[in-house]
């Protein structure tokens, strides 16, 4: 394995170590399913989708396993799409962001385009565009204070080593 591959592997490993801590700080941990601000069934540290079974009480071990699984999906996608070297904390921020918005949203984002153009600060600034949710009650897009707080955490990580 080349030195460059070793460095990239170490960077990814370090980012993967940071990401669960970041997500747990942002999301907290809920062992019982709840409905988030957009009405989506959610559990553990922000897990959504088919792994969430309403009415089930999850254990810490189950939450840890789900978090690793879902971070892994985000990590593999980010690592495949980012074509340039980026700092460890920026990579952790992107894992968290992609975990939150999904791979499709990240893959088609201006943020990704800017990253691959090596415009890292501008890419980090794109996080502030992603603070909206669809409110099922008003049927409108609205700013979420919780999502803004999340983006502030992700932004701090994103720019930390620039």
UniProtKB/Swiss-Prot annotation:
The active site is at residues 27, 36. It is an enzyme of class 3 (hydrolase). It is found in: Host cell inner membrane. It is a single-pass type II membrane protein. The chain crosses the membrane at residues 7-23. GO terms for biological process: cell wall macromolecule catabolic process; defense response to bacterium; killing of cells of another organism; peptidoglycan catabolic process. Pfam families: Phage_lysozyme. Coiled coil: none annotated. Its EC number is 3.2.1.17. One of its GO terms (molecular function) is lysozyme activity. Gene3D superfamilies: 1.10.530.40. GO terms for cellular component: host cell plasma membrane; membrane. The signal-anchor, which may also be an uncleaved signal sequence tethers the SAR-endolysin to the membrane until the latter is depolarized by the holin, resulting in the escape of SAR-endolysin from the membrane. Signal-arrest-release (SAR) endolysin with lysozyme activity that degrades host peptidoglycans and participates with the pinholin and spanin proteins in the sequential events which lead to programmed host cell lysis releasing the mature viral particles. Once the pinholin has permeabilized the host cell membrane, the SAR-endolysin is released into the periplasm where it breaks down the peptidoglycan layer. Belongs to the glycosyl hydrolase 24 family. This is SAR-endolysin. It comes from Escherichia phage T1. The lineage of its organism: Viruses, Duplodnaviria, Heunggongvirae, Uroviricota, Caudoviricetes.
């Amino acid at each position: 394995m080349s030195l460059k591959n070793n460095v990239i592997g170490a960077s990814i490993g370090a980012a993967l170590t940071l990401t669960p801590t970041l997500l747990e700080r942002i999301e907290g941990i809920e062992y019982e399913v709840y409905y988030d601000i957009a009405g989506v069934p959610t559990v553990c540290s922000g897990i959504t989708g088919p792994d969430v079974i309403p009415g089930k009480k999850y254990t810490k071990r189950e939450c840890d396993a789900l978090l690793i699984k879902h971070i892994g999906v985000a990590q593999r996608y980010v690592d495949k799409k980012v074509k340039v070297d980026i700092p460890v904390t920026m990579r952790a921020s992107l894992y968290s962001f992609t975990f939150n918005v999904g791979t499709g949203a990240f893959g088609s984002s201006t943020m990704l385009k800017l990253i691959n153009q090596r415009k890292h600060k501008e890419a980090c600034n794109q996080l502030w565009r992603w603070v909206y949710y669809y409110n099922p009650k008003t049927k409108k897009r609205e700013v979420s204070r919780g999502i803004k707080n999340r983006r502030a955490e992700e932004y701090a990580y994103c720019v930390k080593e620039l």
